[in-house]
């Protein structure tokens, strides 16, 4: 604990300094023989915890000094004086002093008062530390609860796994689907109350703009939209062929049972299976691909898988 003593009587300053040191109350870090030498910024710089100040001093008295420093000094103040006028004592307390000690100096009284002030400071420090810890905990909780602005790497991992399960890894449209997944995740975070999914046009437009940059012309964006849609369509057809092959070989295949009916209309899968079983290489009819359904299910399954992966890691 660091003390500063302001009193025009050298003997009083010496006695107070001796008591502080003998009783291990702290350190007498500075002295002044007049209130005009006491400034709030100086006390703060010296890290003074307790200011001991006389009321009556020739230049600037204790009352006026407290008024001058009360906005810049955050430590505790104990006033020492031979003045007994209730009005002046009351004014000192109204300015925020902790105690008023009457002269002549009584060692026991000084030690008792300074111990109480010291304990109050230590208690305030403890409470402040607890409040700081709680504040950090609350902030950490809020940060965890706050949605991430960037695409979650865990969702990307889930999407990559799904592409492998769907037989689409290595296909040109796989990268486009991952870009769509990222856009849908960020769109859901920014528009949490929007019930309807974005249209395919909106999805492909935003994905194209992100890829080309905002400086791209509308012609370039339209060209990229069409190319991206075609790549994804070819990748979906490849996945359809993949599941039809699995179903033809083993109708109870776990992957076939898990994904085929989720991502495709089953009549389309059944038609593709018949084509594979037919000796005629010519398709019975063009496969009808529901791209919006596929993309929507891909997003939902990736989110579900991501949540499952997180739970397993906890």
Curated annotation (Swiss-Prot):
* Highest taxon of source: Bacteria
Residue list for modification 4-aspartylphosphate: 54
Location, primary (coarse class): cytoplasm
User: Which GO biological process categories is it annotated with?
Assistant: phosphorelay signal transduction system
Q: Where is the signal peptide?
A: none
Enumerate the CDD domains for this protein: REC_GlnL-like (cd17565)
Q: Which Pfam families match?
A: Response_reg (PF00072), YcbB (PF08664)
Q: Which residue numbers delimit the Response regulatory domain?
A: 2-118
What GO cellular component entries does it have?
cytoplasm
**What InterPro entries does the record tag this protein with?**
CheY-like_superfamily, Sig_transdc_resp-reg_receiver, ST_Response_Regulator, YcbB
The UniProt keywords, alphabetically, are: Cytoplasm, DNA-binding, Phosphoprotein, Transcription, Transcription regulation, Two-component regulatory system
* Cellular localization per UniProt: Cytoplasm
What GO annotations for molecular function exist for this entry? DNA binding
Instruction: List the PROSITE patterns hit by this protein, alphabetically.
Output: RESPONSE_REGULATORY
Task: Explain the post-translational modification.
Answer: Phosphorylated by GlnK.
What further note is attached to this protein's record? Disruption of glnL by Tn917 insertion leads to protonophore-resistance.
Function comment: Member of the two-component regulatory system GlnL/GlnK that positively regulates the expression of the glsA-glnT operon in response to glutamine. GlnL binds the promoter region of glsA-glnT in vitro.
**Protein's name according to its UniProt entry:** Transcriptional regulatory protein GlnL
Organism equals Bacillus subtilis (strain 168)
Gene symbol here is glnL
């Amino acid at each position: 604990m660091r003390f500063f003593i302001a009193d025009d009587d050298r003997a009083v300053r010496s006695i107070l300094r001796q008591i502080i040191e003998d009783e291990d109350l702290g350190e007498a870090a500075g002295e002044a023989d007049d209130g005009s030498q006491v400034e709030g910024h100086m006390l703060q710089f010296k890290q003074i915890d307790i200011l001991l100040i006389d009321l009556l001093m020739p230049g600037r008295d204790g009352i006026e000094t407290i008024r001058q420093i009360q906005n810049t000094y955050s430590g505790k103040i104990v006033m020492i004086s031979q003045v007994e006028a209730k009005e002046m004592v009351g004014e000192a307390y109204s300015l925020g002093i902790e105690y008023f000690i009457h002269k002549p100096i009584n060692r026991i009284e000084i030690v008792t008062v300074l111990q109480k002030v010291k304990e109050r400071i230590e208690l305030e420090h403890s409470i402040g530390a607890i409040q700081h810890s709680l504040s950090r905990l609350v902030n950490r909780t809020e940060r965890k609860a706050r949605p991430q602005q960037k695409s979650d790497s865990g969702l990307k991992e889930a999407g990559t796994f799904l592409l492998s399960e769907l037989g689409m890894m290595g296909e040109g449209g796989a990268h486009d689907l991952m870009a769509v997944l990222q856009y849908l995740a960020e769109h859901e975070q920014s528009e949490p109350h929007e019930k309807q999914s974005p249209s395919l046009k909106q999805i492909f437009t935003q994905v194209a703009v992100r890829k080309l940059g905002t400086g791209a012309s509308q012609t370039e964006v339209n060209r990229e939209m069409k190319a991206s849609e075609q790549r994804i369509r070819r990748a979906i057809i490849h996945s359809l062929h993949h599941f039809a092959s699995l179903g033809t070989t083993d109708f109870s295949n776990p992957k076939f049972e898990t994904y085929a009916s989720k991502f495709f209309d089953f009549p389309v899968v059944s038609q593709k299976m018949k084509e594979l079983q037919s000796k005629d290489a010519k398709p019975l009819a063009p496969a009808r691909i529901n791209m919006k359904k596929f993309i929507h299910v891909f997003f939902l399954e990736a989110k579900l898988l991501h949540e499952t992966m997180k739970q397993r890691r906890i």
